[in-house]
Amino acid sequence: MTQDELKKAVGWAALQYVQPGTIVGVGTGSTAAHFIDALGTMKGQIEGAVSSSDASTEKLKSLGITVFDLNSVDRLGIYVDGADEINGHMQMIKGGGAALTREKIIASVADKFICIADASKQVDILGKFPLPVEVIPMARSAVARQLVKLGGRPEYRQGVVTDNGNVILDVHGLEILDAIALENAINGIPGVVTVGLFANRGADVALIGTADGVKTIVK
């Protein structure tokens, strides 16, 4: 199977967690896009969705799914999203698509985080994929200096402005042995909006696309 076929398989497999009559949290990226396609087949059974990016919102609306503002929603049963890396502790690096802040906010509200990914995203140690950090523009250089002190090589993601109007620093060269400590440290740097480490709030279920089918891992 191609990588895209594996992504499609896990996107559709996540439908089993969608309860009729609920509002579903929806992520961003190529794997989440397959889940949105699948969710379109249930649009008459669900109340709607909360979306983590403008791109996902457009796709949801194009399929006739109502998109709610998170402020109008009391709780979410599930949040379904992909990952750039996921380790054995269900901790993830996310933010390759620059939607990390909204993704993290929605994940924090959901009862259950379902990560959908192909097997290439599974790692023993996080950090080979550059760690995205969303930063207030005026703080870019100051934050970069602090990230160097933490052992990383920050690189400004040229030409990218987040849906929140901020910029992204991608931090290379990290071997993340204590993801929770690093998440807390980076989030504590003035000017950082959030870091794409999902360790304090990791995944509850991972659906991993493999050549042998979809593998389910439960925390």
Curated annotation (Swiss-Prot):
NCBIfam families: PRK00702.1, rpiA. Belongs to the ribose 5-phosphate isomerase family. Catalyzes the reversible conversion of ribose-5-phosphate to ribulose 5-phosphate. It comes from the Bacteria. Its EC number is 5.3.1.6. This is Ribose-5-phosphate isomerase A. One of its GO terms (cellular component) is cytosol. The active site is at 103 (proton acceptor). Substrate binds at residues 28-31, 81-84, 94-97, 121. The gene is rpiA. The lineage of its organism: Bacteria, Pseudomonadati, Pseudomonadota, Gammaproteobacteria, Enterobacterales. The keyword Cell division does not apply. Keywords: Isomerase.
